[in-house]
Amino acid sequence: ILAVNEQLGTLMYRDPEITRWNTHQFDAFKVIAHDAFLITIALALEEERFDLVESALRKSYLVQEYEGGGNRPATTDFSVFRQYAQSLHHRNQRLKLNRLSVDADLLKEAYPKGSIPSFEALMQADLVLFL
C-alpha cells in the first residue's frame, strides 16, 4: 500500500522529457496522491492498524523530482503528499466560492455519509497527520 502511495508521489512532478508545461498541469496528481495517502491512513485508523499508521508516518518516501530542469531523487517524509494544488485556489476565486479548503469540499462530496471511509474518518486521519 505504501509503495503505491510512493509511486503516486512521483506523478506530482514533471518528467524530464516534458519540455513544455504549465504550473497547474500536475495539480490533479497532487490531489490524488494526497487523497490516496489520507484514505490509507483513515482506513488503517478505522481498522485499528496503528502499526500501519506508524509505518506510513516513519517511512522515507523516494520521490523523483524534476522541477527546474533538475533530476534529483529525494527521500522525504509523508508531508510530500500534502502539496499545494494552485488550480483549486484558482477555482475558489473564479467561482467566488469563498471556501477555506476546496480540497476538503471535494472530499466531503466524494465520501458522503455511509461511504468507506467516511468523511469523518478522513477528517480524523487529517488531524493525526497534522499532529
Language-model segments: what does each one mean?
Residues 1-131:
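Long, low-complexity, intrinsically disordered terminal regions
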